Regions:
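Short stretches within intrinsically disordered, low-complexity N-terminal or propeptide regions
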Residues: 7, 28-30
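Hydrophobic alpha-helical membrane segments
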Residues: 40-255
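Generic low-complexity segments that are intrinsically disordered, proline-rich and/or Lys/Arg-biased
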Residues: 18, 36-43
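N-terminal secretory signal peptides that target proteins for export/translocation
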Residues: 1-17
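Cleavable N-terminal signal peptides
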Residues: 25-26, 36
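Polar low-complexity intrinsically disordered regions enriched in Ser/Thr and small residues
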Residues: 15, 24-25
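Residue-identity detector for glycine
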Residues: 12, 21-22, 38
C-alpha cells in the first residue's frame, strides 16, 4: 500500500474517534439543556414494580441524567478532559481501565472526601426517590436504615460506572491512562461517604432546616437553607427535573 493511502486511512481513523468524542459531548450538552420543571411536584412516572416497589426504570433514567450533568461539568471546566477527547477513543478507554495499585488518585483532598460523597449521595437520593416505601425522614426504624443501605449500594454501583463504564471518567477523559490517577479512594469513600452524608442530610433537614422554616415564611431563606445543608439532595433534585430545593409534601409556602 502506498504512503498516501496509509495516510488517508490514518486520518479517517482519527476522524472517527473524534466523532465519537463529539457525540458524547453533544449528548451531555443536550441533557443539561433540557429545562427543569417549574413546578415543585414532578410529573408522574411509569413504574416498573419489584417486590420492594422500586421504580427501576425511573432510577436508571434519572441516574443517567445525573451522569450527563457531571460529565458536562467536567468537559466544560476541565481542559485536560477536553484534550483527551481527540485521541483514539476505544484504545485509550481500554488502557484506562485497570485495578488500582494505590489508595490515592492525585485528586485534591476535598474532591475525594467532600465531592465524591456528595455525588454518591445524589445517586443514593435518586434511589430513595424511586423506592416508594422509603421513609422521607430520618428515624430509628429498621425500614429507614434498610432503605439508606440500599441507597448506598446504588451509589456504589453508580460510582463504579462513573469510574469504569462506557460513560465514565475512563472513557471520557481517559482518567486511569496514567496509573497514578486511579486509586481505591473513590471506590471506598464514595459509597461509604454517601451513606453517611445521606443520614447527615436527613438529620439536618428534619431537626434544623425544618425547625428554622417553622420560624420564618421567607421563601428565599427556606430555599437557601435547603440548598446549603442538603447538597446531595439538591443535585439529585436537579437531575430528576425538579427544583433544587424540592421536598415531597413540603413546598416553600408551607405553614
Amino acid at each position: 500500500m502506498d504512503r498516501s493511502a496509509t495516510s488517508s486511512s490514518s486520518r479517517g481513523e482519527v476522524n472517527v474517534q473524534r466523532s465519537i468524542g463529539g457525540c458524547l459531548i453533544a449528548v451531555a450538552v443536550m441533557t443539561v439543556s433540557v429545562p427543569v420543571h417549574g413546578q415543585e411536584t414532578p410529573a408522574p412516572s411509569v413504574f416498573v414494580e419489584t417486590e420492594e416497589g422500586t421504580d427501576i426504570k425511573g432510577t436508571f433514567v434519572d441516574s443517567l441524567k445525573l451522569l450527563m450533568i457531571e460529565h458536562s461539568v467536567r468537559i466544560a471546566f476541565q481542559e485536560k478532559t477536553r484534550r483527551e477527547l481527540t485521541g483514539p477513543f476505544f484504545n485509550d478507554y481500554q488502557r484506562s481501565v485497570h485495578i488500582p495499585r494505590q489508595w490515592g488518585d492525585t485528586d485534591a483532598w476535598w474532591v475525594n472526601y467532600i465531592g465524591h460523597p456528595i455525588h454518591g449521595a445524589a445517586a443514593g437520593y435518586i434511589w430513595i426517590d424511586h423506592e416508594r416505601a422509603a421513609p422521607s425522614e430520618i428515624s430509628l426504624s429498621g425500614r429507614y436504615w434498610a432503605s439508606r443501605g440500599r441507597a448506598a449500594a446504588w451509589a456504589a454501583a453508580y460510582s463504579l460506572q462513573f469510574e469504569y463504564g462506557l460513560l465514565s471518567e475512563a472513557s471520557i477523559g481517559n482518567v486511569g491512562l496514567n496509573p497514578a490517577t486511579n486509586g481505591w479512594v473513590d471506590h471506598v469513600v464514595t459509597p461509604a461517604g454517601a451513606f453517611g452524608l445521606i443520614v447527615a442530610e436527613d438529620a439536618l433537614d428534619r431537626f434544623f432546616v425544618k425547625w428554622v422554616e417553622g420560624h420564618t415564611r421567607n421563601r428565599v431563606w427556606r430555599a437557601s437553607l435547603r440548598l446549603i445543608f442538603n447538597p446531595g439532595r439538591t443535585l439529585s433534585n436537579t437531575a430528576s427535573g425538579r427544583l433544587p430545593w424540592h421536598r415531597d409534601g413540603r413546598p416553600l409556602s408551607w405553614k
